[in-house]
């Protein structure tokens, strides 16, 4: 039985003060959650948020990291910096990173490997665009992303990581993936993992859905057998909304 995981990706939102207020408000609302609860603030908010969640059931993730240990990479953050802070998870390969910052499946793979070296659990994002969905190449695209992004890992590592399926065509387009579409596509992703690492690993890996998740959509989504949680964007910026999703 896979434990559900619901993570809030705050993206480029919240000052340090606002971030602390948000988690302070969130703590009592999610204290009885039956799933793993994760918040992913910006880098500058990480120390304050980590301090605020101490003693609670909320874990903290980063939104990205570099694949090198250190060096001349202006504006980047190394994995050991996150590890030293006490960060637990790291989002890798989010569609916005791929779209605006030229993230590729190869860099995703480098980051995933490096995350494990520093005791960070990767939340690896994958998903297809509207053109790809309408061109009926969703499976081909996802297979490519997973086969490259998760190559050359140990079975133990793959069991630990989290995959987030985010249909890019359902983000800010007015189009939404039905629960059936989400479940079916996540089921397909699981078959790709099975082909790479075996049935036992595929049965254990947790795969989230991340396409405009709201308090009103989560219950039906979580009722689907393949969906193991959610990567939540906008709705994670309000404690009440995020708590409603966590306590589905």
Curated annotation (Swiss-Prot):
Pathway noted in the entry: Carbohydrate biosynthesis; gluconeogenesis; Carbohydrate degradation; glycolysis; D-glyceraldehyde 3-phosphate from glycerone phosphate: step 1/1
Function: Involved in the gluconeogenesis. Catalyzes stereospecifically the conversion of dihydroxyacetone phosphate (DHAP) to D-glyceraldehyde-3-phosphate (G3P).
UniProt record, GO biological process: gluconeogenesis; glyceraldehyde-3-phosphate biosynthetic process; glycerol catabolic process; glycolytic process
Protein name stated in the entry: Triosephosphate isomerase
Primary site of residence: cytoplasm
Xref: Gene3D superfamilies: Aldolase class I
NCBIfam families xrefs: tim
Binding site for substrate: 9-11, 172, 212, 233-234
PANTHER family documented for this protein: TRIOSEPHOSPHATE ISOMERASE (PTHR21139:SF42)
Keywords, alphabetical: Cytoplasm, Gluconeogenesis, Glycolysis, Isomerase
GO MF annotation terms: triose-phosphate isomerase activity
GO-annotated cellular components: cytosol
Chemical reaction(s) catalysed: D-glyceraldehyde 3-phosphate = dihydroxyacetone phosphate
Membrane-spanning ranges: none
CDD domains for this protein: TIM
Family: Belongs to the triosephosphate isomerase family.
Enzyme Commission number(s) from the entry: 5.3.1.1
């Amino acid at each position: 039985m896979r434990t559900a995981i619901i993570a809030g990706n705050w993206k480029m939102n919240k000052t340090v003060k606002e971030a602390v207020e948000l988690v302070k408000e969130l703590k009592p609302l999610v204290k009885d959650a039956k799933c793993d609860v994760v918040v992913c603030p910006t880098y500058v908010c990480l120390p304050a948020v980590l301090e605020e969640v101490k003693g609670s059931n909320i874990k903290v993730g980063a939104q990205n990291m570099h694949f090198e240990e250190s060096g001349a990479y202006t504006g980047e953050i190394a994995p050991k910096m996150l590890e030293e802070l006490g960060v637990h998870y790291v989002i890798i390969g989010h569609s916005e990173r791929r779209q605006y910052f030229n993230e590729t499946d190869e860099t995703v793979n480098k980051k995933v490997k490096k995350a494990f070296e520093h005791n960070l659990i990767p939340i690896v994002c994958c998903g297809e665009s509207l053109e790809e969905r309408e061109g009926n190449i969703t499976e081909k695209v996802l297979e490519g992303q997973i086969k490259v992004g998760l190559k050359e890992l140990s079975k133990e590592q793959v069991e630990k990581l989290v995959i987030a399926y985010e249909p890019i065509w359902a983000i800010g387009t007015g189009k939404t993936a039905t629960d059936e579409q989400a479940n079916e596509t996540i089921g397909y992703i699981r078959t790709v993992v099975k082909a790479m690492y075996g049935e036992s690993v595929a049965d254990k890996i947790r795969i989230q859905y991340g396409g405009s998740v709201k308090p009103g959509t989560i219950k039906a989504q979580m009722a689907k057998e393949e969906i193991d949680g959610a990567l939540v964007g906008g709705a994670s910026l309000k404690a009440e909304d995020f708590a409603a999703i966590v306590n589905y």
